[in-house]
C-alpha cells in the first residue's frame, strides 16, 4: 500500500444465547464503525452468510443437478442420492437464514434496511463523513443448520444415545453474525453474494463476545480466557 493507504475499523460487542432444544441462536450485537476513508458514506453493507442456506438463495437456485444423468438418447431416468434428496427436503422444510429483528443507531432510532440474498444494506439517517464513527445495534436470530444433512462449515450434530434425556448436541458456529462488508480503497464495497465457497476480506477490529449456553456445555473459541475459575473445573483448568 501507498502512503495514503487507509482501512476501516469495526468493533463488535455481541451477547448471544443458545437454545439447545430448538437449535436456535439469538443475539444482540453493538457495532462501532470508524470511517477512515476519504469518502462520505450514506449506507453500510453487511454480510448475512447464513442466508446462503435458504431454499430461495442464489446459491440454491443457481445450483446444477449433481446426480447421475444418462446419455441424452437414453431412456434411463436420472438419479439422485438419498443424501441429496434429504438435503433438498431439509432446506425446503426448515426456516433457515438470518432473521433480522431490529436495526437501530445509538439513539435507538430505527434504521431502514434491505436484505438482498446474503447481503443487507443499512441506510444511515445522517451521512458518515471521513474521520467520523457511528454506533449501531442489530438484534438477530437464526436456526443453526444440521451439519449431518448439509455438511456446512458450521452446524450442529445430535447424539441421541448420550446419557442425557433426549440425547445431546454439539454446535460449531461459523459465519454466524451479521458483519460489515469491507470497504476498500481499490473497490469500494466488496458486496458480493456468498455462494458457499471462497473467503471474504474483513475489516480489522476488536471483539467482545459473551455466550449464554446450557450448563452442561463447554464453550471453545479463539482468544484469551478471562474467567477460567468461573467456567471450568479444576481438572479442566489443569489440562490447559
Language-model segments: residues:
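Extended, low-hydrophobicity, Ser/Thr/Pro/Gly-biased non-transmembrane segments
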Residues: 69-102, 106, 139-240
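N-terminal, polar/Ser/Thr-rich
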Residues: 1-26, 174
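Intrinsic-disorder/low-complexity, polar/charged segments enriched in Ser/Thr/Lys/Arg/Asp/Glu/Gln
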Residues: 11-13, 24-30, 43, 119, ...
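Short aromatic-acidic-glycine turn motif
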Residues: 50-60, 217-221, 235
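A short, structured loop/turn motif at beta-sheet edges
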Residues: 20-22, 36-40, 105-107, 126-136, ...
Amino acid at each position: 500500500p501507498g502512503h495514503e493507504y487507509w482501512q476501516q475499523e469495526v468493533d463488535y460487542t455481541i451477547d448471544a444465547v443458545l437454545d439447545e432444544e430448538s437449535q436456535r441462536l439469538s443475539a444482540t450485537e453493538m457495532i462501532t464503525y470508524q470511517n477512515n476513508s476519504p469518502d462520505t458514506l450514506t449506507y453500510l453493507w453487511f454480510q448475512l452468510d447464513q442466508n446462503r442456506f435458504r431454499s430461495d438463495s442464489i446459491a440454491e437456485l443457481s445450483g446444477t443437478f449433481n446426480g447421475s444423468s444418462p446419455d441424452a438418447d437414453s431412456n434411463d431416468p436420472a438419479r439422485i442420492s438419498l443424501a441429496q434428496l434429504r438435503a433438498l427436503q431439509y432446506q425446503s422444510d426448515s426456516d433457515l437464514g438470518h432473521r433480522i429483528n431490529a436495526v437501530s443507531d445509538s439513539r435507538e432510532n430505527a434504521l431502514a434496511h434491505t436484505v438482498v440474498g446474503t447481503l443487507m444494506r443499512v441506510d444511515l439517517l445522517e451521512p458518515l463523513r471521513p474521520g467520523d464513527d457511528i454506533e449501531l445495534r442489530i438484534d438477530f436470530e437464526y436456526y443453526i443448520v444440521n451439519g449431518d444433512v448439509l455438511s456446512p462449515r458450521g452446524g450442529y450434530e445430535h447424539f441421541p444415545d448420550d446419557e442425557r434425556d433426549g440425547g445431546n448436541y454439539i454446535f460449531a458456529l461459523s459465519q454466524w453474525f451479521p458483519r460489515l462488508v469491507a470497504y476498500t480503497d481499490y473497490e469500494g464495497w466488496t458486496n458480493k453474494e456468498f455462494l458457499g465457497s471462497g473467503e471474504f476480506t474483513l475489516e480489522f477490529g476488536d471483539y467482545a463476545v459473551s455466550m449464554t449456553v446450557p450448563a452442561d456445555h463447554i464453550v471453545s473459541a479463539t482468544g484469551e480466557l478471562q474467567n477460567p475459575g468461573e467456567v471450568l473445573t479444576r481438572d479442566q483448568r489443569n489440562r490447559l
